[in-house]
Amino acid sequence: MGETVFAKILRGEIPCHRVYEDDHVLAFLDVGPLSRGHTLVIPKEPAVTLDALSDDSAAAIGRVLPRIARAVLKATGATAFNVLQNNGPLAHQAVMHVHFHIIPKPSADAGLGVGWDPLVGFDHGEAAVLARAIAAAL
């Protein structure tokens, strides 16, 4: 993994507004927030994408992500939020270090806007083959 802004934050070379830290995870406010309280949750392990993250780091994030989300909601007064996690440039990952966005959604206009354009023509036969392939890859 190349040098990232998150690596510099983890080393203390760039300041951040920390909201949580333990041995495996750091959470801090996003400097380009989509809404008030937009928080980034990152592993201290230098993995680029979620599939490259160790099980231990993934478990550490999984344990604290709900807790941090509850704190963001309480502090901002929002009642809805999105959790966003992008993997790779095609998926709009801007910083090549695994990170989760907790983005409060205080109103219809504020926060993350999401469009959903599902594939047309779901094929159950193809889905069965794909499901077996995914299960076999586990």
Where are these regions (language model features)?
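HIT superfamily nucleotide-processing domains
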Residues: 1-138
